[in-house]
A protein has these predicted regions:
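Residue-level signature of outer-membrane beta-barrel architecture
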Residues: 73-77, 117, 166-168, 212-216, ...
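Residues that define the transmembrane beta-barrel architecture of outer-membrane proteins
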Residues: 63-69, 105-109, 154-160, 202-208, ...
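Repeated loop/turn-to-beta-strand initiation elements of outer-membrane beta-barrel proteins
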Residues: 81-84, 122-125, 171-174, 221-224, ...
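Outer-membrane pore/translocation modules
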Residues: 103-207
């Protein structure tokens, strides 16, 4: 009887232990599932400076001072088959040249959002949205007197449409949108420019849009970021392709100091018949906030 009771008691204790372990594992698994982060947020603020000064310099020269402030903010959402990426890119820069005064060197606000529904490995049904403009007036100083070539929300571009997304990682993606709508907005002063008919403030186009992103490390402490957008209007000259391509190279000195090189090329017949090119080189103070923060 004693052996039977001990045997029975041992079996009961064993079963209870197994149940407790199983329940604990289930709770941990459920907890991991519930607490698994869906959002990943990353922000980067950079101040870029360059300066030169001359005093009694035999070969001559002009005192210059320039500064840029850039803010990039990424919001990435992932849950099961849903992928939603949103990126804010904004920057403003001015330069001071003796005898010329202050001039704008950079002025940009761009909001990109891309929603994807996974269909297979690395492939998604997608819907893109893009809005870009500038903050302040821009001038062409080659003309006398200087002429205004842009203003606040003039022009402003709103682009959206369905497509297919290939996304291998947060560092490599390509979106193809064959039926993309684009609206161009201007104020009364720029009516008749940027593809908008005289007397109107908006223009509509429907076309093919391709956008890509690729970031990689060239070597330790050196990274290259490539952002490209191409657009062809079905309703106008389909052979004219608008191009916006930017390359950013960053050399990391330490956690807060980086060397920045930017090459930015724009081809857009509606704004200029010439190829637009911008280059920036400078030493920057960087601050990362919400770096790879998840919740």
């Amino acid at each position: 009887m004693t052996h039977f009771n001990l045997f029975t008691l041992n079996r009961i204790l064993l079963i209870l232990c197994l149940l407790l372990v199983s329940n604990s594992y289930s709770q941990d698994k459920e907890k991991d599932t519930i607490l698994k982060p869906k959002w990943k947020v990353n922000g980067r603020l950079a101040f870029i400076f360059n300066q030169s000064s001359f005093s009694n310099w035999a070969s001559g020269g002009q005192n210059t001072l320039a500064g840029n402030i850039n803010l990039n903010y990424d919001f990435n959402y992932k849950k099961e088959n849903i992928n939603w990426d949103t990126r804010i890119i904004t920057g403003y820069g001015i330069s001071y040249v003796s005898e010329q005064g202050y001039r704008k060197t950079d002025d940009r606000f761009e909001l990109n959002t891309l929603l994807g529904l996974k269909t297979s490995t690395n492939w998604f049904l997608s819907f893109i949205g893009n809005f870009k403009t500038q903050y302040t007036k821009g001038f062409d100083y080659k003309q006398e007197p200087k002429s205004m070539v842009s203003g606040f929300l003039a022009p402003a571009y709103l682009t959206f449409g369905p497509g297919m997304l290939f996304k291998k990682s947060d560092e490599l993606s390509l979106n193809i949108a064959p039926a993309t709508a684009r609206y161009t907005f201007v104020n009364d002063f720029f009516s008749g420019k940027f593809g908008v008919e005289e007397g109107k403030n908006t223009a509509f186009s429907l076309g093919f849009n391709l956008s890509g992103y690729y970031k990689f490390s060239i070597m330790k402490n050196i990274e290259m970021e490539n952002i490209i957008t191409m657009y062809s209007d079905y309703l106008a000259n389909i052979g004219n392709v608008d191009l916006d391509y930017q390359t950013n190279i960053r050399f990391k000195v330490n956690s807060h100091i980086k060397m920045h090189i930017t090459f930015h090329t724009i081809i857009d017949d509606n704004s200029s018949s010439k190829i637009q090119f911008r280059q920036l080189f400078g030493l920057g103070v960087n601050y990362n906030f919400h770096e790879k923060r998840t919740f």
